[in-house]
């Protein structure tokens, strides 16, 4: 015989969701999560940074669902077009939920529906549902740290840039030893110098646009 708890003790969330469901592009939403979750903070003393901040932004008359995450050292942001934006209120999606949802989006086919309540969010995908509490806290005004009047832009091949950084960074096993980028008009010098394991250097083609 097994001792069991009363079924009435099991929490139910279905009655809490009164807002209309919002249909999301599953592939684009997965990309949004993957692009932002890398910057989620692990510092539990600032719990409001332990997730992805989802909110509505507007550009050229179009509404976007924008996700932002930061650990105060780096910041990641990604957006996708959204309808029924008036049904969505800003919230912080917890780290664990972000990773669980990413797995669901990878493994299950079907239409992705999102619905929110006062302090919870629900995702429906195929025959699966994921309901999560959201983080109770205020996400910092990240727009204050994003440059708006920068006259400099650097264009590189993303594939070549990532490969170069991975090769050069492999020289050092110490995370505290950063990769140095030296920027010129037609190239970028990628280098790392380690007191214990040596140094690495690579040069990749680039185009620097600058008024100065």
Residue ranges and their predicted role:
Residues 1-212:
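Structural preference for solvent-exposed beta-strand-turn elements
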